Amino acid sequence: SLKLILCQGLHKPPHTGGAIDWHQDDYYFRIDKMNAVVSCWIAFDQATVDSGCMWVIPGAHTQLWPHESLESPGYRMLGADESKATPLELSAGRFMFHHGATPHRTLANTTDNPRRALAIHYMDATAHTLDGNREAEPPENMPIVRGASAG
């Protein structure tokens, strides 16, 4: 059974900043169970290196890396080997799933076109959010999207 944690519309206008530094979704969501979060990233426009596609560090999802707070909203992950970073370019309408502990980032859009996407984050319905959860939403308010409620 799955609960919806967060659904985000992501928009990178042409020739703008909008880079999101390395992070792991598990760091934000603060779930009491390992391997409980999965995220789906859907490209509405062509997502290329130049337009700010998703980058991942393969194999680095086996641990939760330390993060530091940034002045702007968010965190930056520390310590992972960025030399293995891989861009995941997607055509419009394509999607990718990633584990909640997969380190990922997006860079600025330097093209003449927007780069829009939708990120949908799910968690195991038997898991619970911990105090300090980024969204601070009670689990009972998270809709069940597959299966039955854990109670």
Predicted features and spans:
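Catalytic core of non-heme Fe(II) oxygenases with the double-stranded beta-helix
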Residues: 16-87, 127-135
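Short, solvent-exposed aromatic-acidic interface loops
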Residues: 10, 59-62, 140
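A structural signal for short, well-ordered beta-strand segments
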Residues: 7-9, 40-42, 118-122
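Short acidic-glycine-tyrosine-enriched beta hairpin
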Residues: 84-97
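Short, surface-exposed recognition loops or helix-turn segments adjacent to catalytic cores
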Residues: 5-12, 54-57
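Signature of the catalytic double-stranded beta-helix
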Residues: 1-8, 30-33
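A structure-centric signal for secondary-structure junctions around beta-strands
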Residues: 6, 37, 51, 114-117
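Non-heme Fe(II)/2-oxoglutarate
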Residues: 69-70, 95-97, 101-151
